[in-house]
């Protein structure tokens, strides 16, 4: 990691939250699927391809991994139904890897099947 990246990483916690929000807003589409698809549409009109990511990882509760998997499935439904030039980025620990490999495989296979 470059020296500049290290400085930025160490400085961010010291910044006022409203300043961090101004910087983050360039990269965070919003809090809902509707927000994400709206922003994706805007970027697609400018000829950008988009990767959508749900923030979070290291989930330890099975029910949460199911909820997160279902959100990704709905996100894929919206990407397809709106013909968005987009994909999703999934962190293995967000869909159960920390709980166990079988939980992760089950959730990952659901997403792969939906994405076909």
Where are the language model's segments positioned?
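Alpha/beta catalytic barrel-like cores
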Residues: 1-116
């Amino acid at each position: 990691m470059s020296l500049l990246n290290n400085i930025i990483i160490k400085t961010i916690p010291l910044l006022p939250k409203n300043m961090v929000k101004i910087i983050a807003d360039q990269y965070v589409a919003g809090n809902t699927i509707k927000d994400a698809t709206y922003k994706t549409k805007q970027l697609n009109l400018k000829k950008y391809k988009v990767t959508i990511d749900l923030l979070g990882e290291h989930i330890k509760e099975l029910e949460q991994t199911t909820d997160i998997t279902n959100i990704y499935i709905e996100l894929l439904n919206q990407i397809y139904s709106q013909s968005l030039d987009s994909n999703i980025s999934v962190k293995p620990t967000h869909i159960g890897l920390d709980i166990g490999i079988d939980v992760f495989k089950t959730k990952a296979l659901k997403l792969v099947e939906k994405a076909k």
